[in-house]
Curated annotation (Swiss-Prot):
InterPro entries: Rbsml_bL25/Gln-tRNA_synth_N, Ribosomal_bL25/Gln-tRNA_synth, Ribosomal_bL25_b-dom, Ribosomal_bL25_C, Ribosomal_bL25_long, Ribosomal_L25_dom, Ribosomal_uL5_bac-type. Gene3D superfamilies: Ribosomal protein L25, beta domain, Ribosomal Protein L25, Chain P. PANTHER family: RIBOSOMAL PROTEIN L25/GLN-TRNA SYNTHETASE, ANTI-CODON-BINDING DOMAIN-CONTAINING PROTEIN, RIBOSOMAL PROTEIN L25_GLN-TRNA SYNTHETASE, ANTI-CODON-BINDING DOMAIN-CONTAINING PROTEIN. Part of the 50S ribosomal subunit; part of the 5S rRNA/L5/L18/L25 subcomplex. Contacts the 5S rRNA. Binds to the 5S rRNA independently of L5 and L18. GO terms for cellular component: cytosolic large ribosomal subunit. Residues 220-229 have a biased composition (Low complexity). This is one of the proteins that binds to the 5S RNA in the ribosome where it forms part of the central protuberance. SUPFAM superfamilies: Ribosomal protein L25-like. HAMAP family: Ribosomal_bL25_CTC (MF_01334). This is Large ribosomal subunit protein bL25. One of its GO terms (molecular function) is 5S rRNA binding. It holds the Pfam family Ribosomal_L25p. One of its GO terms (biological process) is translation.
Amino acid sequence: MAENVLSAQKRTEQGKGPARRLRQQGLIPAVVYGGKREPTHVALDPATLLKAIETPHKFNTLLELQVEGASKHVLFKDYTVDPVTRKLLHADFLEVSMDQPVKVNVPVVTVGRAAGVAEGGILSVAAHAIVVEALPNKIPVRIEVDVTELKIGRSLHVSELKAPEGCKFKFQTDYVVVFVAVPEKEEVAAPVAAAVPGAAPAEGAAPAAGAAAPAAGAAPAAGAAPAKGGEAKGGDKGKK
């Protein structure tokens, strides 16, 4: 891994006020952690930092930080940006020793076209990064996962991956990294039979929505039997 040189200056003032004044000067506050020393508070040019990590390693880029004549190896670990302007406001660095391994997150990249995708499956990446332990100058750019033989319903776990030379995976061995999911079938609703205009409702069925109820006192149709308990009209009144 190539090293990029980054210059910074020590800062003695801390807090929101001094940090604001630094940004007005075109610099940002930063902190260097790690090692056996107390954290070092520095100020640096954000544009220079962003340019320094324009490498395939991104955040895992090994940097040589020069602070007032002293030099130390660091990794860019964290940052804060303005939510509106997206400008870099603060940075954190991890000081490392070239002969001591470090743990970092390395991105996962799939290689090839899964056999299950050709069968209609959907390739899903469950772990977008894996924790790797390696010397600072041996940190890999990415973890490549060959998915060519992966069929529908199958998955690859961390235990099935080969770690890059000089690296160890520090991750759950049974963790699923990538899998091919079975596509979901769309449920088709059963067709609803349309009502036939003028058809009489089934016996005991309620009238259709919007149908008018018979008018009160309306006479039944000719020949119709009177309602139960009702009085017949137009017939004999019975023998005396």
